[in-house]
Amino acid sequence: GLGDTDLGKGVHIDKLVQVAHDVTVGANTAIAGCAAIGAYARIGSHCIIGGAACVAAEVHLADDIVITGMSTVNKSLSKAGVYSSGTMVSEHQRWRRNVARFCRLDDYMMRLTRLEKECSKAHE
């Protein structure tokens, strides 16, 4: 069945926020307008969920986490800090290609750095 949603002391929830069933929100957390929290999510204390952000069902967020506006959180986060996601609107096919490339961007940069070092040594 549906369980209770538990809001800790000092929680601030803005207008047009959707909070599903069986959600726990820790003390002194703020959730900005148009955000959505999925069922069974656990939000820690002293967190900030930005406007139009989405926390997927069953995701757990540690204490002291900031989710910037319009971000989608699809996995649990155990380390305090600021997290962002999202891209600007574009045609769907282009967006799909760019997201795939973006996910490999760090690997590309490490490879490029390694190749630059190899080229520098070859020209010495």
What residues fall within each predicted segment?
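Long, leucine- and charge-enriched amphipathic alpha-helices
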Residues: V89-E124
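Structural signal for interior beta-strand "rungs" in well-ordered beta-sheet cores
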Residues: G1-E91
